[in-house]
Amino acid sequence: MANYFNTLNLRQQLAQLGKCRFMGRDEFADGASYLQGKKVVIVGCGAQGLNQGLNMRDSGLDISYALRKEAIAEKRASWRKATENGFKVGTYEELIPQADLVINLTPDKQHSDVVRTVQPLMKDGAALGYSHGFNIVEVGEQIRKDITVVMVAPKCPGTEVREEYKRGFGVPTLIAVHPENDPKGEGMAIAKAWAAATGGHRAGVLESSFVAEVKSDLMGEQTILCGMLQAGSLLCFDKLVEEGTDPAYAEKLIQFGWETITEALKQGGITLMMDRLSNPAKLRAYALSEQLKEIMAPLFQKHMDDIISGEFSSGMMADWANDDKKLLTWREETGKTAFETAPQYEGKIGEQEYFDKGVLMIAMVKAGVELAFETMVDSGIIEESAYYESLHELPLIANTIARKRLYEMNVVISDTAEYGNYLFSYACVPLLKPFMAELQPGDLGKAIPEGAVDNGQLRDVNEAIRSHAIEQVGKKLRGYMTDMKRIAVAG
């Protein structure tokens, strides 16, 4: 099979990369009704599989789970989760032939085997759903022409998909129809009903394409979302210890610092995050971020180039075929790093202390978010998509580090994200070591003293922060999510 994106001509590639439309609330007036009375079978019962299924059932849909015979016979975790939540569970052969919509929510590396198994069992005119388009775009999976292929991609982990639904809200979601597989022209109706059933329409839905979702998702997770946090954690910890900081304190400052810093990012973008600093610290963080952007820009561009060309995917799929040798080696090496093995700090670190003593970390977040966003937009991805795949998801990933350091992050994210994370962080750490050697007192681990600043310089820096394109689109999207949340809670 050929990489689907690479079979398109340049005009088609640009059209699919640039497909992104923020959908109006009125477009979801029918809710999930298009799928009511139809049989929806989910393949896979992991975090997305279970939590999407719970939401869809609560929205009035007929949901069941198709699992491998061995998973049922051995009562594996997927079987236990589905049955304990009261779902009907059966084998592929028992459930797939009756399904109107089959949703494949297994890990990326299992998609080809799953799709090749279920396709012959699917009835004529059924629909196949994904929450990530890797199998279609990068693997180039060929789907029967009578089958409609759609995607609903919540921009949050499965657990948050469920929690936001229970609160009467939802999470921002991308939906798409594969242009090669919409024989009856009903793909968009199916995708909208599925998104509404998960609650996504209450938080904002982008009509996108399989191509735009995959290319932007891969770029975000490899660079700012995972790779930058891993590289930053390792570099900052080593620098703090080298400067004489207690390893336990250094570990806590970093482990919980990312989450604290990005909580401000979530509420008010880069502007609010930078406003948490004193004026002298803000000016220093801005200067550091500009240096970091200049150093890291070629690395971000290389990752985007390799994602667009398919080189990243072909390399990762070769590792799949080699029993994940590279992935497992990198995972083991990460677990042995000084940051991961440092003792726990029992003392308390106040919220503002994370900002005051984490100026470099804030600079890394700012540089990484802006670079990821800029690189995606320069490649033809629309700003709204780039925002969701950079700034929006960062607090969610930072939260995983706060739970159990880098180990937890790499367990929670997909194997695809983890593989890309290692590629980036293994290149980024040596790249930034000369920069780390030139840091000044107050950049990390110590607060920058209050002092006079030049009003003109502060004015210009504030304007540069606020006028960046990601701040403009972010303000619009965050405002929409807030408005939608008020509507959902009220009604």
From Swiss-Prot:
Effect noted on mutating H132Q: Loss of reductoisomerase activity. The reductase activity with 3-hydroxypyruvate and HMKB is nearly normal, and the isomerase activity decreases 24-fold
Effect of K75Q: 13-fold decrease of the catalytic efficiency and 3-fold increase of the affinity for NADPH
Active site: H132
Induction: In the presence of acetohydroxybutyrate and acetolactate and by the activator IlvY.
Record entry for activity regulation: Inhibited by N-hydroxy-N-isopropyloxamate (IpOHA).
Subunit composition and interactions: Homotetramer.
Function, in words: Involved in the biosynthesis of branched-chain amino acids (BCAA). Catalyzes an alkyl-migration followed by a ketol-acid reduction of (S)-2-acetolactate (S2AL) to yield (R)-2,3-dihydroxy-isovalerate. In the isomerase reaction, S2AL is rearranged via a Mg-dependent methyl migration to produce 3-hydroxy-3-methyl-2-ketobutyrate (HMKB). In the reductase reaction, this 2-ketoacid undergoes a metal-dependent reduction by NADPH to yield (R)-2,3-dihydroxy-isovalerate.
Designated name of the protein: Ketol-acid reductoisomerase (NADP(+))
